[in-house]
């Protein structure tokens, strides 16, 4: 019962930022711009994904002092990234009071086989997923929020779209099997394909969605990108490099918040999309060498 209560509390926090925008920030000034723009939360990190991609090297957890400075400067929740499998980085982030830990493929993985046992923490976690199997495996480990992986730092939404479609298609299969009474197929799917407990599959079949909130991330650069992902069924969006690598960060941040909230109102999205200045320079996915793709990290 204690574990269930903890899961409910963690998922409850994640629901608090539903329909909102989480913005990557690297300093206090950016965090304040994000808060003023209406961000639901900020992600504190030393380098945005676009810079990590260009500069290379090993990307690690950010300096705790920088994270604390941002926490002191804003009243909205502050998240921070830990490397995949690096449970000590997660322990440090929990100890300084971050509101949510992102076990992130943007950073260099510390463990190529295992993810963090998120049930061992009181802090909630968000994790990336490319398909239903990855999403449910992270939830089984204790994740309170899922996001598409997309391809961070590219300003190109195509991979986020691909990942959201894959999750939606997986859910549709589960629901279809359940409605047709194909219990044997569901059991086989859980055991051999998705590699998760049947209880999670049953929960997906009943809810007809993931049992936790599911945000878009990776390549969101414009208000239209944000609205696209929301119309595909996302519960909110993460924006990494797309704001502070653009020509007018404050205006673009506000516009993306408005578009996320009014995702089904094209006239509003069109209005807020005017005069935003230059968007970040994007990268075509097929121009990225296979070994440089971030979304492959963690399975």
Curated annotation (Swiss-Prot):
Enzyme Commission number: 4.3.3.6
Q: So where does D-glyceraldehyde 3-phosphate get bound?
A: 165
Q: Which reaction does it catalyse?
A: aldehydo-D-ribose 5-phosphate + D-glyceraldehyde 3-phosphate + L-glutamine = pyridoxal 5'-phosphate + L-glutamate + phosphate + 3 H2O + H(+)
Residues forming the catalytic site: 81 (schiff-base intermediate with d-ribose 5-phosphate)
What terms describe the molecular function in GO for this protein?
A: pyridoxal 5'-phosphate synthase (glutamine hydrolysing) activity
Name the positions where D-ribose 5-phosphate binds. 24, 153, 219, 240-241
InterPro entries per record: Aldolase_TIM (IPR013785), PdxS/SNZ (IPR001852), PdxS/SNZ_N (IPR033755), RibuloseP-bd_barrel (IPR011060)
One biological process term from GO is: pyridoxine biosynthetic process
**Pathway per the UniProt entry:** Cofactor biosynthesis; pyridoxal 5'-phosphate biosynthesis
Task: Determine if ATP-binding is one of this entry's keywords.
Answer: no
Its domain of life? Archaea
Pfam families with a match to the protein in the record: SOR_SNZ (PF01680)
Keyword set for this entry?
A: Lyase, Pyridoxal phosphate, Schiff base
Q: Subunit comment for this entry?
A: In the presence of PdxT, forms a dodecamer of heterodimers.
- Quote the PANTHER family the UniProt record gives: PYRIDOXAL 5'-PHOSPHATE SYNTHASE SUBUNIT SNZ1-RELATED
Family, as annotated:
Belongs to the PdxS/SNZ family.
Protein name, entry field: Pyridoxal 5'-phosphate synthase subunit PdxS
Organism of this sequence: Methanococcus maripaludis (strain C6 / ATCC BAA-1332)
Query: Its encoding gene is what?
Result: pdxS
């Amino acid at each position: 019962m204690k574990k269930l209560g903890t899961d409910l509390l963690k998922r409850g926090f994640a629901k608090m930022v539903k329909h909102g925008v989480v913005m990557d920030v690297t300093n206090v000034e950016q965090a304040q711009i994000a808060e003023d723009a209406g961000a639901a939360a900020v992600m504190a990190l030393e380098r945005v994904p676009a810079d990590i991609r260009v500069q290379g090297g090993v990307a690690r957890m950010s300096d705790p002092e920088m994270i604390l400075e941002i926490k002191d400067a804003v009243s909205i929740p502050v998240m921070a990234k830990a490397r995949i499998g690096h449970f000590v980085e997660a322990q440090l982030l929990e100890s300084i009071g971050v509101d949510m830990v992102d076990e992130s493929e943007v950073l260099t993985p510390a463990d190529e086989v295992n993810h963090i046992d998120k049930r061992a923490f009181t802090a909630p976690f968000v994790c990336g997923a490319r398909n239903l199997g990855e999403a449910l495996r992270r939830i089984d480990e204790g994740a309170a929020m899922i996001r598409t992986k997309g391809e961070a730092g590219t300003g190109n939404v195509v991979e986020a779209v691909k990942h959201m479609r894959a999750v939606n298609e997986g859910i549709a299969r589960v629901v279809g099997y359940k409605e047709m009474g194909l219990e044997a197929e569901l059991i086989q799917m859980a055991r051999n394909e998705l590699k998760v407990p049947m209880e999670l599959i049953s929960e997906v079949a009943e809810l007809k969605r993931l049992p936790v909130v599911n945000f878009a991330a990776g390549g969101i650069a414009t208000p239209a990108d944000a609205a696209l992902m929301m119309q595909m069924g996302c519960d909110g969006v993460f924006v990494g490099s797309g704001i502070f690598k653009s020509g007018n960060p404050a205006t673009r941040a506000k516009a993306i918040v408005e578009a996320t909230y009014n995702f089904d109102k094209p006239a509003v999205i069109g209005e807020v999309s005017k005069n935003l200045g230059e968007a970040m320079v994007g990268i075509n996915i097929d121009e990225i060498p296979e070994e440089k793709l971030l979304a492959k990290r963690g399975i």
